[in-house]
Amino acid sequence: MVLMIVSGRSGSGKSVALRALEDMGFYCVDNLPVVLLPDLARTLAEREISAAVSIDVRNMPESPEIFEQAMTNLPEAFSPQLLFLDADRNTLIRRYSDTRRLHPLSSKNLSLESAIDKESDLLEPLRSRADLIVDTSEMSVHELAEMLRTRLLGKRERELTMVFESFGFKHGIPIDADYVFDVRFLPNPHWDPKLRPMTGLDKPVAAFLDRHTEVHNFIYQTRSYLELWLPMLETNNRSYLTVAIGCTGGKHRSVYIAEQLADYFRSRGKNVQSRHRTLEKRKT
């Protein structure tokens, strides 16, 4: 059974995540004190029910040791996973302005901007040990819920999930990435007028890139690097490995290479997911 701990900065989508988990059959509790986690888990273990609990600045333990002790006291039947939701500062400010809600730390006479920064510092101990960090800056409510359903329901228990995501550097580096590879030095299909409207998912773009030796070398060396360290990552009790591939716009080279890497590791029996940030953004 899974004990999903949902944390993150206020305004990043924790309530949406908790509702999505409830729809998936999790027993959900909002803002349960950390010290009560073992008691809740023992009660649900008897009923064989997975649980999801949100933790934010309102119920953060006074020290990281309290959280670690609570995790140690969980029943063996439960596999704890920590999901941390985040968004960039400007997005959080906009969301609070749109909803006109009060930030949890604003009561301490802090401005909204200062409250967001203070909260980030307070939550860093949880963020640093998260199994999965999700950047919701570019996501709608429905996209976040669907992404969680895909990643969590499609995940085999206790097995590392490899996530390959393409992005464009002009849109910023994904904050949920464990590894970032820059492919802007590779031949660019953008300069071919016939290929420019296409994406790395289209066969003509794939054929263009496939003709270049340096593209093959990059894919080979990148997958070799990941294969070298993957056994250690798998034994490090982590649930996700997110590999971000970036080109200028996130439309051609990064998409193609992310798909090539995803296909390779999928063919080796790994649990693999792929995501294309720029292409998903264009659909909205």
Swiss-Prot record:
Residues the entry annotates as binding ATP = G8, R9, S10, G11, S12, G13, K14, S15
GO MF entries:
ATP binding; GTP binding; RNA binding
Region labeled RNA-binding — which residues? 266-284
Q: Which UniProt keywords apply?
A: ATP-binding, GTP-binding, Nucleotide-binding, RNA-binding
Q: Name one Pfam family in it.
A: RapZ-like_N
Family assignment from sequence similarity: Belongs to the RapZ-like family. RapZ subfamily.
Provide the assembly information: Homotrimer.
Q: What the protein does?
A: Modulates the synthesis of GlmS, by affecting the processing and stability of the regulatory small RNA GlmZ. When glucosamine-6-phosphate (GlcN6P) concentrations are high in the cell, RapZ binds GlmZ and targets it to cleavage by RNase E. Consequently, GlmZ is inactivated and unable to activate GlmS synthesis. Under low GlcN6P concentrations, RapZ is sequestered and inactivated by an other regulatory small RNA, GlmY, preventing GlmZ degradation and leading to synthesis of GlmS.
Record-given protein name: RNase adapter protein RapZ
According to its UniProt entry, this protein's organism is Escherichia fergusonii (strain ATCC 35469 / DSM 13698 / CCUG 18766 / IAM 14443 / JCM 21226 / LMG 7866 / NBRC 102419 / NCTC 12128 / CDC 0568-73)
Provide the gene name from the record.
rapZ
